[in-house]
Amino acid sequence: LVGSEMCIRDSNNSGEFNYPAHTGNWALLVASSKEWTNYRHQADVLAIYQQLRQAGYTDDRIILIVEDDIADNVSNPNKGVIQVTIGGNNVYENVEIDYRMSSLKAKDILAILNGEKSESLPTVIESTENDNLFVFWSGHGVPGAMCWDEEPYAMTGDDLSTVFKDMNLKRRYRKLLMMVEACFSGGVMEQCEGIPGMLFITAANGDETSKADVFNGEMKVWMSNRFTSTFIEQITDNKDVAMRDLYYRLFINTVGSHVMVYNAENYGNLYSANMSEFINFKNDKSK
């Protein structure tokens, strides 16, 4: 199904896959913009961070990348406070930031994903074939690429596909879920299809922009994006939601763009696979 209808590839026919035992979780959260006008990107990533912490992730299993120029910004009337809804919780509370966005290049994200430590990258994903990996990216996008600050073609689908294939060869994950809130994001993640055990959900297809959500007239900024706010609503209500049901709810509630799912045929049955494997999994290493 294409066009204005839901687009999910073969999910109803996908069989079950034989995955290794699930013993741990990792997360990489990235806001790829800075400055007050882009408030929503960092706010959304911090809101996801709070969801993971509440679900039992420890900070050593979350790599958080934001510019951190919002909470104490001169334009912020409530210093030290970042929210995704008017009057909502402070998603900046007790955060542990691993890297400022401006201290990295987009390609550093690939090294972090692939566990490549260096003097400039002391903290990386150290996952194994028994770990599920959740990646959430929020920022700007252009056709065929995701932006890094003001660099428009900073991260392409080929860039991600190359490192994902290497991660698969090295058995650096059990399952990987990557969600992208960016304009034209579908065109990037579509290039990553064909890799076993990975699922990609994007806020928009490859030909359209994604949409902001919740405008704060006093602060003169958008506080969130529609895709992310819907995602947070869904996992707050039910952290065990099936992937197919999550996609359906994202699709019907994300007005103005078409939420897309890619690589379902290489992931498994989306009716039985669910978010608890990424957002609500309890074990001795991440709780």
For the regions a language model picked out, list residue spans one by one:
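Short, small-residue-biased leader/transition segments that mark boundaries at the very start
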Residues: 1-8
